[in-house]
């Protein structure tokens, strides 16, 4: 046989075998932590198809946040959830913030109900949502915190996938037991290092351990120069510092929370590795959101340098999404 033809056949066989190994091995990670290569392969599996779908099947995400001081945070979270692929995004915010957010985008569904006397209206909206993000721009007023506790309790009853960020994390640091034993499909917390220390202090005061006190359905992403994901299953934990830059623009965490709301719903719906494993879904969705956000950051920084803002990161969503999922 011609040596060139033989080499070509051998190369084709190796490529085919490599592909088969990828497919068969990506779900075999019972002993060691998930590696980036495996996480990237699993990330591809959560992306839903577009053919033959009706509006809403790619996800309906709710963002609960905003205040008289902060209108950008819930907008960044909501518009990201929409632009990465959720079909519908609802924003529940204060009356003063609602008008501003509506002027930012006609694509978002905005409700001016974030007030204690509207709790019944909020409860009537949550069943529409496939995943709920609580915290962006929420504020820390006592009335607001109590309202958030009531909303979290209602999400528990409805078993809604929950993402807690920013002032939502502050609320938990003041009442750590509010998410204790949260039912499946669970909660993902997304603190930065400062917020993580406050949460750790809250857990310590309750004589609890960092990632076991809340129960097996609560996972944590600690954001820093290197992101770290913690769950109660060691194999699903990971660390990653790919992408990103030294520029920490205000609003970057809100972008991540919105993306995570969408990806969390997708991961839960995809039955990764042929099984409904909540912690695996949380791990892969969080990895995808962290990688995507870091790519938005690095791409925006390459263009804008130190003048980069979260608004510049929004412009890189399409490109970052393609690199994350394709």
For each feature predicted by the language model, list its residue ranges:
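Small-residue (G/A/S/T)-rich helix-start motifs and N-terminal tracts that mark the onset
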Residues: 3-4, 9, 13, 17-161, ...
């Amino acid at each position: 046989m011609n040596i060139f033809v033989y080499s070509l056949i051998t190369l084709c066989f190796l490529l085919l075998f490599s592909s088969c190994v990828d497919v068969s091995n990506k779900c075999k990670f019972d002993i060691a932590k998930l590696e980036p290569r495996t996480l990237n392969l699993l990330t591809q599996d959560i992306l839903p198809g577009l053919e033959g779908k009706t509006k809403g099947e790619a996800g309906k995400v709710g963002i609960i946040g905003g205040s008289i001081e902060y209108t950008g945070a819930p907008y960044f979270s909501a518009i990201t959830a929409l632009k990465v692929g959720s079909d519908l995004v609802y924003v529940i915010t204060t009356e003063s913030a609602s008008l501003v957010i509506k002027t930012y985008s006609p694509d978002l569904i905005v409700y001016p109900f974030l007030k204690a006397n509207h709790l019944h209206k909020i409860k009537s909206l949550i069943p529409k949502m496939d995943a709920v993000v609580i915290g962006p721009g929420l504020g820390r007023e006592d009335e607001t915190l109590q309202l958030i506790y009531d909303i979290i309790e209602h999400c528990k009853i409805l078993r809604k996938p929950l993402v807690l960020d920013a002032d939502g994390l502050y609320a938990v640091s003041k009442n750590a037991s509010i998410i204790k034993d949260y039912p499946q499909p669970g909660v993902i917390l997304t603190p930065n290092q400062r917020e993580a220390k406050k949460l750790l202090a809250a857990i310590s005061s309750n004589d609890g351990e960092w990632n076991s006190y809340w129960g097996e359905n609560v996972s944590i992403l600690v954001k820093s120069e290197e992101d770290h994901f913690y769950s109660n299953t060691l194999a699903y934990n990971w660390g990653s510092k790919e992408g990103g830059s030294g520029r920490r623009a205000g609003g970057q965490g809100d972008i991540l929370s919105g993306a995570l709301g969408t990806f969390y719903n997708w991961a839960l719906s995809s039955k990764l590795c042929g099984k409904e494993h909540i912690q695996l879904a949380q791990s892969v969705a969080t990895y995808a959101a962290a990688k995507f956000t870091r790519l938005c950051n690095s791409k925006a920084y390459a263009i804008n340098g130190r003048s980069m803002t979260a608004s510049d990161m929004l412009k890189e969503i399409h490109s970052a999404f393609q690199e994350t999922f394709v």
